[in-house]
C-alpha cells in the first residue's frame, strides 16, 4: 500500500524543481497522487475497509489544498503539473 523507497526517489527526481528539492508542491502532489492510486486499487479489493477509505479522503483533500495553493501562486506550474499527472482539472 505504501510507496517503495525506489519509487519515492524516482518520483522526487521526476518532479523536483531543483537538485535538492524534496518538498515543493509539485513533489508533494506527485507523492500523494501515487499513494492515492495505490490506495484506490486496495479499496477495489477490500471494499469494506472504511479506515483506509477515510485515509484516502484525507489524502485527496490534502492534494486538493496543495493544488489550490499552486494555482494561486503560479498558474503555469499548476497547469504543467496537472498535465503531467493526468488530473482532470
Swiss-Prot record:
GO terms for biological process: translation. Pfam families: Ribosomal_S15. The lineage of its organism: Bacteria, Pseudomonadati, Pseudomonadota, Alphaproteobacteria, Acetobacterales. Keywords: Ribonucleoprotein, Ribosomal protein, RNA-binding, rRNA-binding. GO terms for molecular function: rRNA binding; structural constituent of ribosome. InterPro entries: Ribosomal_uS15 (IPR000589), Ribosomal_uS15_bac-type (IPR005290), uS15_NS1_RNA-bd_sf (IPR009068). The keyword Ribosomal protein applies. Part of the 30S ribosomal subunit. Forms a bridge to the 50S subunit in the 70S ribosome, contacting the 23S rRNA. One of its GO terms (cellular component) is cytosolic small ribosomal subunit. This is Small ribosomal subunit protein uS15. SUPFAM superfamilies: S15/NS1 RNA-binding domain. The keyword Transit peptide does not apply. One of the primary rRNA binding proteins, it binds directly to 16S rRNA where it helps nucleate assembly of the platform of the 30S subunit by binding and bridging several RNA helices of the 16S rRNA. Forms an intersubunit bridge (bridge B4) with the 23S rRNA of the 50S subunit in the ribosome. It comes from the Bacteria. NCBIfam families: S15_bact. Belongs to the universal ribosomal protein uS15 family.
Amino acid at each position: 500500500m505504501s510507496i517503495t523507497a525506489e519509487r519515492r526517489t524516482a518520483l522526487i527526481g521526476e518532479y523536483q524543481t531543483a537538485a535538492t528539492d524534496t518538498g515543493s508542491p509539485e513533489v508533494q502532489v506527485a507523492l500523494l497522487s501515487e499513494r492515492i492510486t495505490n490506495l484506490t486499487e486496495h479499496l477495489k479489493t477490500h471494499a469494506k475497509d472504511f479506515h483506509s477509505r477515510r485515509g484516502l479522503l484525507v489524502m485527496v483533500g490534502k492534494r486538493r489544498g496543495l493544488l489550490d495553493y499552486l494555482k494561486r501562486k503560479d498558474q503555469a506550474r499548476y497547469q504543467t503539473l496537472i498535465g503531467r499527472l493526468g488530473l482532470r482539472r
